[in-house]
A protein has these predicted regions:
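RNA substrate-binding interface of SAM-dependent RNA methyltransferases
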Residues: 26-112
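Conserved beta-strand segments that form the floor/walls of ligand-binding pockets within enzyme
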Residues: 19-21, 35-36, 62, 129, ...
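Arg/Lys-rich RNA-binding interfaces used to dock onto structured RNA substrates
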Residues: 1-43, 174-175, 181-184
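Short beta->alpha connector loops at strand-helix junctions that form conserved
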Residues: 2-4, 38, 64-65, 87, ...
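Short, hydrophobic beta-strand segments that form beta-sheet elements in well-ordered domains
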Residues: 1, 19-22, 90, 105-110, ...
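Structured adenosyl-cofactor binding patch, chiefly the S-adenosyl-L-methionine
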Residues: 18-20, 50-56, 68-84, 140-184
Length: 184
């Protein structure tokens, strides 16, 4: 209805012509390899991460609170629909996550990581790849969880963008799955 300003009040976009009310789907993680994000804060990064995960056959995303709302329109838009293929679950703490998945091999991605990612081989069984916040990374206490690893890069930068580091890590950990893949 042209005279109704409700859509304009609810939408953050100028060219919105319809609004839908939906119930949020409650998701839980399944067994398998996981990506764990500790306190992620960037909406665009979150959507890009979801899309990248799907591209490398990672279907489980754990988010340690506080973290972005995966149902935010900016996240949904950036995910290009990937979100609807993932299992996503929020946890109040990393310890709560570990209680649910105690048998996973833990790999923490950190600037102070002990092992170069190129020297890490994924073991049999499931693993969890743990990444920190975009601006601060993982706190030093995460050095005590599992195996801490780093992605080597030139001295010209301090760190890599979270979604880029995640993409490189997923490529490394899924290299055996895709090594014989032909052009799409």
């Amino acid at each position: 209805i042209e005279s109704d300003n409700t859509i304009q009040k609810l939408s953050k976009k100028d060219n919105c012509f319809a609004i839908a009310i939906i119930k949020k789907y409650e998701m839980t993680l399944q067994e398998g390899n996981h990506v764990v994000l500790v306190n992620p804060g960037d909406m665009g990064n979150m959507g890009t991460i979801m899309r990248t995960m799907l591209g490398f056959n990672y279907y489980n995303l754990a988010i340690i609170r506080p973290g972005v709302d995966v149902f935010d329109p900016r996240v949904l838009r950036a995910s290009m629909g990937a979100m609807f293929h993932l299992n996503i679950e929020y946890f109040d703490s990393f310890e709560d996550y570990l209680k649910r998945f105690p048998s996973h091999d833990i790999y923490t991605l950190m600037l102070k990581g002990a092992t170069n990612i190129h020297k890490v081989e994924s073991k049999e069984g499931y693993h969890s790849l743990v990444f920190g916040n975009e601006s601060s990374g993982l706190p030093d206490e995460y050095l005590d969880y599992g195996k801490s690893i780093f992605i080597p890069h030139s001295h010209h930068i301090d760190s890599l963008n979270l979604s880029m580091a995640l993409g490189m890590t997923l490529m490394h950990f899924s290299k055996d799955e895709f090594k014989d893949k032909e052009v799409l």
